[in-house]
């Protein structure tokens, strides 16, 4: 009949490796509604670190499919590449262009968290659904530096 949880809970549905402290954990949100995607995993309220770190678009994403066409897809698997690409652009800005030549993983995560913007309906940040907020690369790069 399919897979299901014996006793489902709304929180604590993130799995390894997203629960590790040094990784950048990504949740999904609906960019058209500026709202959390309810299928996205949630962190635990009881751990000393809040996960996910941030959320990226993961609902109704246009993506290439085999055969040379496109389809509308949904899932955190489509949110994570937004963050990966943003991390790569930050590293280009920092290391290649010399704005932060000693940029490393934890600093990339800190820049992305700093630039995250609020998602509607939340008072507390970080939280177990969208972390520090939704991805915004433009706000992640320090002002005055191009």
Report each predicted region and the residues it spans.
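Hydrophobic alpha-helical segments
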Residues: 41, 91-93, 145
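Intrinsically disordered, low-complexity segments enriched in small/polar residues
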Residues: 2, 119, 129-131
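Extracellular S/T/G-rich loop segment that most often corresponds to the catalytic His/Ser-adjacent loop
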Residues: 3-88, 139
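Hydrolase catalytic cores
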Residues: 58-125, 134
